Amino acid sequence: MEGIIKAICISKQKGTEKHPVQDIEIIEDHGLEKDAHAGKWHRQVSLLSYEKREEFKAKGANVEDGAFGENLLVSGIEFTSYPVGTQFKMGDVLLELTQIGKSCHSHCAIYHQVGQCIMPRQGVFTRVIHGGHICVGDKVEVIENK
């Protein structure tokens, strides 16, 4: 299975919309350079299916890249269909799936702006096994557990 990076998004603070960039350095065991969610934990990089975001937009929501706090918006891959431990390769970068969905304990700024959030159901989280440089348009390869 292969997908394409449609957007790369970062933010300075947690719980806010992220803004798109054309390319970025992903740091091993840390996350995206200059992103608030980067650090030594299991949710270093968040991914969201472009198709799921487009389905949400088709219901009338006015959302842009990064609106749900996703780091990578990727077309062609249904992330929630893969188990924890699945890896995603983008050039030299290797990410490992650590969490599917998340709890939304209190409605964050994203929820208040959009009315709901798809990250609790459709977002996935990864840790960085190997860092490198990625760009919008790069291919994403799924490496399934054996």
Functional labels for PLM-detected ranges:
Residues 1-146:
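Metal-cofactor-dependent catalytic cores
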